[in-house]
A protein has these predicted regions:
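Conserved glycine-rich Rossmann-like NAD(P)H-binding loop of the short-chain dehydrogenase/reductase
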Residues: 24, 28-44
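Substrate-binding pocket helix/loop in short-chain dehydrogenase/reductase
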Residues: 94-95, 102-107
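SDR active-site lid
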Residues: 169-229
């Protein structure tokens, strides 16, 4: 009998790990293919969550490694029920502190890799399969000193919602998950070396509840998942107010 698979990128920590925890508990999922760069973290994850975890060490900023992943899929031809594109890269700073290398890595991991993972997994997905792409509250409007990160997350939100319409005929659901600030290592790493940048993270939440709501919303065939009243208020404000004003309010909040 064909194994049913959930694929989770960025699975070794943070929100990705919370998704992995939830998916291993689902009886309909035989294996969770956990993708991350660090083999040691993946080994720890397997010890913690059990035999359902199948680790794959893949650097999603490397196109060659993504192609190797695609070739592994072609050999195994799994029945993919869930694809969670959680892997992300962030630098919260002025353009002056953002190198060309970091800029391109952010685009590769946050945008290119999501598209590549989605296209590589779609041939092995069927009706009722789910794709959850992690966008952000930052996607709702342009954000100075978060300019590239917010732009990559806006790409993910629009890509996911448009793709969801295209995949309706196949019965595959795509959900853009738009969390606010979360208690993960991403934010500590993102501010390292920034002389001037984002440093006030209001409405910080634990990633577990965000993951639970995201899966629930995907199962309810919602094309967006927004957790917490704070983030919902931010979304409404970004729709009602001119973005020039929203950016000024953002700068005032961050004291920039």
């Amino acid at each position: 009998m064909e194994r049913t698979i959930a694929v989770v990128t960025g699975a070794s920590s943070g929100l990705g790990k919370e998704f992995a925890k939830l998916l291993v508990r689902r009886k309909e999922i035989d294996e969770v293919w956990a993708i991350a760069r660090r083999k040691d973290k993946l080994t720890e994850l397997k010890k913690e969550l059990g035999e359902k975890i199948i680790p794959f060490s893949v650097d999603l900023s490397d196109a060659g490694q993504i192609i190797s992943w695609q070739q592994a899929l072609e050999k195994q031809k799994p029945d993919i029920r869930y694809l969670i594109n959680d892997a992300g890269f962030a630098k919260f700073c002025s353009y002056l502190d953002l190198s060309i290398e970091d800029s391109l890595n952010m685009i590769h991991v946050n945008c290119d890799a999501v598209v590549a993972m989605t296209l590589s997994c779609l041939p092995y997905m069927n009706a009722k399969s789910k794709i959850l792409n992690i966008s952000s509250q930052a996607s709702f409007q342009p954000l100075p000193y978060l300019n590239l990160y917010s732009a990559t997350k806006a790409f993910i939100r629009h890509y996911s919602r448009a793709l969801n319409v295209e995949l309706e005929e196949r019965g595959i659901q795509v959900t853009a998950v738009c969390p606010g600030w979360m208690m993960t290592h991403l934010y500590g790493r993102a501010t390292v070396g920034a002389k001037k940048g984002t440093h006030k993270f209001y409405g910080m939440k634990k990633p577990g509840p965000v993951a639970r709501k995201a899966l629930k919303d995907a199962d309810l065939y919602k094309d967006m998942s927004v957790y917490s009243l704070y983030v919902k208020g931010s979304h409404l404000g970004a729709k009602l107010l001119p973005h020039r004003l929203v950016m000024k309010l953002w700068l005032y909040q961050q004291k920039l």
